[in-house]
Amino acid sequence: MKAILLVLLCTFAATNADTLCIGYHANNSTDTVDTVLEKNVTVTHSVNLLEDRHNGKLCKLGGIAPLHLGKCNIAGWILGNPECELLFTVSSWSYIVETSNSDNGTCYPGDFINYEELREQLSSVSSFERFEIFPKTSSWPNHETNKGVTASCPYAGANSFYRNLIWLVKKGSSYPKLSESYVNNKGKEVLVLWGIHHPPTSTDQQSLYQNADAYVFVGSSKYNRKFKPEIAARPKVRGQAGRMNYYWTLIEPGDTITFEATGNLVVPRYAFAMNRGSGSGIIISDAPVHDCNTKCQTPKGAINTSLPFQNIHPVTIGECPKYVKSTKLRMATGLRNIPSIQSRGLFGAIAGFIEGGWTGMIDGWYGYHHQNGQGSGYAADQKSTQNAIDGITNKVNSVIEKMNMQFTAVGKEFNNLEKRIENLNKKVDDGFLDVWTYNAELLVLLENERTLDFHDSNVKNLYEKVRSQLRNNAKEIGNGCFEFYHKCDDTCMESVKNGTYDYPKYSEESKLNREEIDGVKLESTRVYQILAIYSTVASSLVLLVSLGAISFWMCSNGSLQCRICI
């Protein structure tokens, strides 16, 4: 009975002791992040750095609508293909859109010289002034300006020609030498286009230009070239055995361009005074145009985001995140969100000495749970939580600011003869893209590792702060908890939490209780030893009596014979 009372006393004393535990916040978050050492670590809070959503629409950029070329391409639009007539009045745009079936380009067959370079030039133009550089009615009185039409460029069922060019042919039976100049007084670059016609036969050459040995000269301060028609039989394209090559140049302000010819010249009628804009570009997209606004446009759709990375499309126009190949870039801001003990990190992980987080503590990341005679409850440590929030917020903002270099990234133009250069360029671009992706992923992995270790150390520091105050006035019972050797009411608990715990005040009470508990433990140990000896002896006696009784019974009924020899 004495032993039982001692055991009950010990249990009662342990059960009624006041306790204080250090712990951390937990919630129902399913966010996962990757670190250098682990993948898919569940955390309480995180921020996404990778945009993977778009609206599937072509939108205005900065409030300015794009120029959608429809079934026309750049060549058809800038030369004035009759099928592109609806585009001729457009003078400004945010970016230019071609579609995958933009087939209306050069209606009269031939080569557009340096077409890819022209596209590059136009990709940085946001508006232009289309003006009549050589008026049709007054510039060419000695040449025919209305008969230069062709069935390959029809309009409304009749033969027609490019709206921005004039195909000059002989007037009557003569094609006198022409010489016309234009001085650029627009104060900006002027784009001028012209063409050279190459007939299939000498008969066609004479019927169109009269002069068998014709030439064309075009010159400015930066461009000088003499052309001779190449008369030769060729396979018909769009019903034409002849060919027409198209040329262009940029005239600087104050510069002069001169056209001199005795035949075969397709002269410019309209030219373009260009205004460049850094946010413009050319994209190929089949997405529909909508009345929406965005800061970043891709061929797949518009992106409205402040995130530093996107994996939607490498071609972008406007203020856009950097494209990476990653499928996930999530940065941890909160703590591990797991209920079981797992060791990890510089400090052995939060769960190295605390089993799991507290969903009941909702007003901070780190804090306390106490239990005493006045009740129990959770309380966050606001100072350490706020310091952690400030530090992590500054870090996240710094990462986003450093990586959020928004810019336009458009494709480069190469013609069919430059495939090797194009392939090399793609390899270089892919290499840069791989480096960007690797750097972004490594940065996130390292920062996630540091953040989780940072939280681990904060919980550890909070635990050490309490332990250093309590010293031997309480004992560590594991799982981040302390059991007081003295009564600790709510005021006492609060003093531990805010760092003002009065150790000497409770030392004497703690010493007495500690000695009493140690004495109870010692007496309990002695009683248990006596009980163990008693039970061993009693068990042996019962076993011997049982064996004797069985032997006597077996001898009495003859089942067992006993012989005693002397």
Swiss-Prot record:
Subunit structure: Homotrimer of disulfide-linked HA1-HA2. Interacts with human CACNA1C.
Site location (Cleavage): 344-345
Membrane topology classification: Single-pass type I membrane protein
Protein family per UniProt: Belongs to the influenza viruses hemagglutinin family.
TM ranges: 530-550
Function of the protein: Binds to sialic acid-containing receptors on the cell surface, bringing about the attachment of the virus particle to the cell. This attachment induces virion internalization either through clathrin-dependent endocytosis or through clathrin- and caveolin-independent pathway. Plays a major role in the determination of host range restriction and virulence. Class I viral fusion protein. Responsible for penetration of the virus into the cell cytoplasm by mediating the fusion of the membrane of the endocytosed virus particle with the endosomal membrane.
Keyword Ribonucleoprotein carried by entry: no
Name the record gives this protein: Hemagglutinin
Disulfide bonds: 21-481, 59-292, 72-84, 107-153, 296-320, 488-492
UniProt signal peptide: 1-17
Gene name linked to the record: HA
Stretches assigned to the Extracellular side: 18-529
Glycosylation site list: 27-28, 40, 104, 304, 498
Subcellular location: Virion membrane; Host apical cell membrane
Note from the entry: Major glycoprotein, comprises over 80% of the envelope proteins present in virus particle. The extent of infection into host organism is determined by HA. Influenza viruses bud from the apical surface of polarized epithelial cells (e.g. bronchial epithelial cells) into lumen of lungs and are therefore usually pneumotropic. The reason is that HA is cleaved by tryptase clara which is restricted to lungs. However, HAs of H5 and H7 pantropic avian viruses subtypes can be cleaved by furin and subtilisin-type enzymes, allowing the virus to grow in other organs than lungs.
Molecular function in Gene Ontology: host cell surface receptor binding
Biological process terms in GO annotation: clathrin-dependent endocytosis of virus by host cell; fusion of virus membrane with host endosome membrane; fusion of virus membrane with host plasma membrane; viral budding from plasma membrane; virion attachment to host cell
UniProt topological domain (Cytoplasmic) ranges: 551-566
Residues with a covalently attached lipid (S-palmitoyl cysteine): 555, 562, 565
